[in-house]
Amino acid sequence: MLAVLSPAKRLAAQPALDLPADLAPSEPRLQDQADALARVARDLTAADLRRLMHISEPLARLNVARFAEFHEARNAAVPAVALFDGDTYAGLEARTMDADALRWAQERICILSGLYGLLRPLDRIQPHRLEMGTRLATERGATLYDFWGDRIAEALNARAAETGARVLVNCASVEYFTAADRAALKLPVITPTFLEERNGERKIVSFWAKRARGAMARFIAENRLDDPEDLRAFRAGGYAYEPDLSTDERPVFLRAG
């Protein structure tokens, strides 16, 4: 079983992660593609970044500086799970994983990225902001989806071949998972859905659902899950499996609001 997560917009101010002696940070396998994208992004102005990603002027200026220094600042790279600091990563809580869970996560948890394509948790990355839905024109097309094409799906296929994984658990957002070309992907996909019930209405509450996606990835890693049916035992954040709302491809987890 593989699991995929979205990255986080919010980055840790002081990223830190204690690793066991036999587990070292790794390098992104699609680093050459990230370098190519960074060269394109380096030519963008703060106004361009504001328009493309709808971000503030200070954040745009910060990322202009980051892309300008991207190829000279590799020493600033840190493990992805230490740098990402959003709700999903609050649910994952990589800093509190034991050594065995971290080792398993390094092999089986994948992080989708607009800049790096596909990451392992301990892959060293640099601070950046480049969302997958960004309409950044490259020689491959008008968007990052065009740039990545089937490369992310093929990288997932390669990970599955290396690990023997037979299914992919999609804990990413629609924006990011769209980058995994389903026509090229050789794995069946299971997409857990996290709903909140309040006043008789069931809906996705973004804050809790993002945390639950991270917690689901942690649950998979800690228990070294391979059988999709074992996902049903997930209990975190008040969520519990709801069989009446679920299908094999879309297990639903419900919490009271």
UniProtKB/Swiss-Prot annotation:
GO terms for biological process: response to hydroperoxide. Pfam families: H2O2_YaaD. One of its GO terms (cellular component) is cytosol. InterPro entries: YaaA. Belongs to the UPF0246 family. NCBIfam families: PRK02101.1-3. HAMAP family: UPF0246 (MF_00652). PANTHER family: PEROXIDE STRESS RESISTANCE PROTEIN YAAA, PEROXIDE STRESS RESPONSE PROTEIN YAAA. This is UPF0246 protein RHOS4_29700. It comes from Cereibacter sphaeroides (strain ATCC 17023 / DSM 158 / JCM 6121 / CCUG 31486 / LMG 2827 / NBRC 12203 / NCIMB 8253 / ATH 2.4.1.). The lineage of its organism: Bacteria, Pseudomonadati, Pseudomonadota, Alphaproteobacteria, Rhodobacterales.
